[in-house]
Amino acid sequence: MCVYCAAGPTHPELLELAGRVGAAIADRGWTLVSGGGNVSAMGAVAHGARSRGGYTVGVIPKALVHRELADVDADELVVTDTMRERKQVMEDRADAFIALPGGIGTLEEFFEAWTAGYLGMHRKPVVMLDPFGHYDGLLDWLRGLIDTGYVAQAAMDRLTVVTEVDAALTACAAGMAGQDMTGETMAGETMAG
């Protein structure tokens, strides 16, 4: 389960959400794949998973090892040469994606996973967990682009937006079981468990 999230803000509600997501992933016996930082929501999601005995994989570019304080407690810490390589490793290691409230880094990772899913490059669930309305303006703007042809309705349909942790994980469950969003087996795609 790949979780995209912030590496800067320390808002208590964000850290609590990230910790609950990590714990819920571990409670289901799933592996957490995250950005490999030990700060903000990125650190909280990993700590949450480990607090329940979960297995964590952190993926961080060399350039961010000190800036984001690499999560040296991760069960696996993968250090990549570039941000692009980081995203590829995270996508390859994951069976589903959840984006928590975050900034441009979170959005960049999320948009790449969402776009790849929409274009048929993978059939993994892509979920936005937004209990605070953080992304409301962005989602309204994207929906507004449907009428002008800049965003296809099928692209919006490929994204699941929820406000509850359990709903996010339920939306990801098919991918974590090796199935796509329709229940079909994802042949040829790696199941990270």
Language model feature labels by segment:
Residues 40-47, 134-146:
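Glycine-rich, charge-decorated loop segments at or immediately adjacent to ligand/cofactor-binding or catalytic sites
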Residues 60, 100, 107, 114-140, ...:
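Short, acidic/small-residue loops that bind anionic groups at enzyme active sites
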Residues 34-83:
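Glycine-rich, small/polar surface segments that engage phosphate groups of diverse ligands
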Residues 1-55:
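Glycine-rich beta-alpha loop segments
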Residues 6-9, 38, 62-64, 102-106:
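Short glycine-rich anion-binding loops that position phosphate/pyrophosphate groups of nucleotides
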Residues 92-96, 147-193:
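A charged, well-structured terminal subsegment
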Residues 78-117:
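Internal catalytic-core helix/loop-beta-alpha segment
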